Amino acid sequence: ESGWNRIFSFNLEPGYVLLNKLTSVIFNDFRFFMIIVAAITVFPMMSVYRKNTRNAGIEIVIFINMSTFIMMFSGLRQAIAISLGLVALSYAQERKLVKFILIILFAMTFHLSAFMLFFIYPIYHHKLRKQSLWIIVPAIVLIFIFNRQIFTLLTMLLPSAYSDATLSFSNAFTMIILLVIFVAYSFIIPDEGSLDETGKGLRNLLLFSLVLQLFAPVHNTAMRMNYYYLVFIPLLLPRVMESRKDRWANLTELSKFVILLFFTVYFFYYAYTSTGSLHVFPYHFFWENV
């Protein structure tokens, strides 16, 4: 335990250190700190999801299969920042720019990578036309082909904590394939006249998430940056389904069933067989002796 004069001498973001110190002064029990972190993480996320939900079942099964869900069990600092990122999305939807900026600056006091949230506002409100896909799709292909070279250049612009990272290959191709499927689904299925502004904004964020994911095979830093955007995807797909074109009605109903079944089965299979996912599985309660 450290005195107040030393709390900002740690090589950690000040918001997290201050929260840790305040909790230790009041409770002096690490379990209470975990409870508070869980509350700060879950309740803002729950509020934004509840506000934007269209199909809770589909949203839940997609969310728990996103890598962000697993990370939240161990990456406490970034879990708080991601939750605040959902609040930032809410402010972006309401065009409250000052509050949007302030909540992101606050999130950065818990994890510096939260600077990625600043992209939400312009991307969400961009009026993207389907004709633009003739440029976007080839650009995405080129980014994937030259992802290593592009990432090397981008790291020069990042804070030193990220720019000092050495390049390494990771197994992130499965998520790329999944995001490509989601992007195709979100552009093919809906009637553009029926898809509301929230749906179009979330679809823009999905495209940006795909672009970020293209760099994940090069280095896990890109995956860390994308955690902030993966949590928006579960909110998008039910809106796409609601706005489906008449000719895709049967396919949409089938996709609901497939998504619910596949992601439910996959989650339990992954939880049962996985051994290296940030030591989350198999899950043990704190009172268990393992």
Regions found by a protein language model. Give the residues of each.
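Short hydrophobic/aromatic helix or loop-helix immediately within or flanking a transmembrane segment
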Residues: 3-28
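Transmembrane-helix signature of polytopic, membrane-embedded enzymes
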Residues: 46-66
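Transmembrane-embedded, aromatic-rich helix segments that form part
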Residues: 100-103, 113-124
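Membrane-interface transmembrane helices that cradle and orient dolichyl/undecaprenyl
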Residues: 85-98
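Short acidic/glycine- and proline-prone juxtamembrane loop motifs at membrane-interface regions
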Residues: 73-79
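Signature aromatic-anchored transmembrane alpha helix within multi-pass, membrane-resident enzymes
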Residues: 137-138, 247-267
